[in-house]
Amino acid sequence: MSIKSDRWIEKMALEHGMISPFQAGQVRENQNGRIISYGVSSYGYDVRCSNEFKIFTNINSAIVDPKAFDENSFVDVQSDVCIIPPNSFALARTVEYFRIPRNILTICLGKSTYARCGIIVNVTPLEPEWEGHVTLEFSNTTTLPAKIYAYEGVAQMLFLEANEVCAVSYRDRNGKYQGQTGVTLPRT
């Protein structure tokens, strides 16, 4: 496998709709001043989260069960910032919609700005021919509330080209998260 460069990422985004909306170069400021950067980088793409958040709460004393997840365990918030309680987590989605080519596997890593504050971003790989908005999971590992900024960079996508094309893609097997557009809860 080889990692793909900024030139390849830009070409695939502009000519094949791999990332939409797409930002060429890094954006580090907006009308309000400095922000956490997003856009294409040397060997990746820094994504933004939207202003749709689901903040985990255990007001119902539920057991966290991925096979039978209780939607009432979340509070929906629409805001330019999300405050995650101590030792808790929140879900969000990317602003960007992805269409992953059949010969590409995409890995997501959290941005160091958040990691250095004890905020971990977790996303599973984007498989060949998967498409949709990426559901992001933010874990607050600290004993204090933590802030996430909507419309700013939160994670970096790395694009890896396979040595050969897979026999069965995510689309071929009708993956359960194919085409997701909102913050998507666990499915079985």
Swiss-Prot record:
GO terms for biological process: dUMP biosynthetic process; dUTP biosynthetic process; nucleobase-containing small molecule interconversion. It comes from Legionella pneumophila subsp. pneumophila (strain Philadelphia 1 / ATCC 33152 / DSM 7513). Pathway: Pyrimidine metabolism; dUMP biosynthesis; dUMP from dCTP (dUTP route): step 1/2. Catalyzes the deamination of dCTP to dUTP. The keyword Nucleotide-binding applies. Keywords: Hydrolase, Nucleotide metabolism, Nucleotide-binding. It comes from the Bacteria. InterPro entries: dCTP_deaminase, dUTPase-like_sf, dUTPase_trimeric. Signal peptide: none annotated. The active site is at residue 137. CDD domains: trimeric_dUTPase. Belongs to the dCTP deaminase family. It catalyses: dCTP + H2O + H(+) = dUTP + NH4(+). DCTP binds at residues 111-116, 135-137, 156, 170, 180. Its EC number is 3.5.4.13. Homotrimer. It holds the Pfam family DCD. GO terms for molecular function: dCTP deaminase activity; nucleotide binding. This is dCTP deaminase.
